[in-house]
Amino acid sequence: MKKENVKILGIESSCDETAVSIVEVSKSDKGKILSNIVFSQIDEHSPFGGVVPEIASRSHVETLNPLIDQALEEACLKIDEIDGVAATSGPGLIGGLIVGLTTAKGIALGLNIPLIGVNHLEGHALTPILTNDISPPYILLLVSGGHTQLIMVKSIGQYSQIGTTIDDAAGEAFDKAAKFLDIGYPGGPALENLAKKGNNKKYNFPRPLQNSSECNFSFSGLKTSLIREAKKIEPINDGTLADLAASYQEAIIDCIKIKSEKAIRKILKENQNTEIQYFVASGGVASNKAIRDSLEVIADKHAMQFIAPPMKFCTDNAAMIAWVGGLRLLRGQKDKLNIPARARWSLEELSLIHISEPTRRS
């Protein structure tokens, strides 16, 4: 694309947040967030203790168009001043993805502007370049409600997975435990807050796969262990509940630390001729302060700088979608109007798509 800067309207609807953002992206791989609107569906899902896909989809339908108007107003732009529209096309809940992607297709068709379908995971993976002004290569821990992965980000569009979860993601481990303990929704923040009041050494929960040489995670057995322990000591008073939460969170953190350190050692050994300065955490669970603090210690140990986006850009947002859409559009990539929504879509599949070398950052 010949333009030096593009203004991209981004739409995120892969789960239970409806989000719209406008980001100005330059060929030097720098971005300016002009607006960033997020509508949370917490109140709608709270009675059920988790996300109900049909309710999520209906809420996206009801709120998306007003949010687009709000984002344009906040950015002081008219719709015809947008250079392209990007929407999450996977992975995620298929109903929500269809709502956002269909809306983006309508805008692209009506304005005759490019459409870019964005991988939600790539949005999280590249957010630190936008928010923290860093450049690849870097080692990424992508830790969210549906994914827990260790990834080598070689460049924009080139990713190598070092480890992933073989069952539940870390975010699921938080959410399912919180639902079982009946401590509130959303479960992750509720359990984190409760853990602050407890003794994290009170219960000795397992650290699955800690002795495995691989960098994969497993959280399902840990969750089962918590349920068994809680049933042994019923009824549970407030102090015991806090101790359970603290000990459980500590076990999750240890699992993340153990595997992150193995991944760092592996990547640094295999890339001795490449300077890798950053260990990055992104995704909703990366907003957990205890996890951030533990990862910073690991980064320091390996003479790396720990980077995590501001908390509002760790959780789902549309700025990351607009950002990736702009990066890809400036590299000559756009999608046809028949691009499908995809419930599953790995980052490594993206690496099979040719993408030009990123412009040198000034």
Positions of PLM-derived features:
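A contiguous, well-structured pocket-lining segment that forms one wall/lid of small-molecule binding clefts
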Residues: 36, 193-279, 285-302, 329, ...
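N-terminal beta-alpha supersecondary unit
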Residues: 5-81, 87-91, 120, 124
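Glycine-rich phosphate-binding/hydrolytic loop that grips phosphoryl groups
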Residues: 309-347
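Conserved phosphate-binding catalytic cores of ATP/NTP-utilizing and phosphoryl-transfer enzymes
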Residues: 1-4, 117-139, 324
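Single conserved hydrophobic/aromatic residue that forms the stacking wall/gate
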Residues: 353-362
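Conserved phosphate-binding/catalytic loops in two-lobed NTP-binding clefts
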Residues: 117-118, 278, 296-321
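Glycine-rich phosphate-binding loop plus the immediately following alpha-helix
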Residues: 154-199, 223-224, 228-233
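Short beta-strand scaffold segments in enzyme catalytic cores
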Residues: 18-24, 140, 148-152
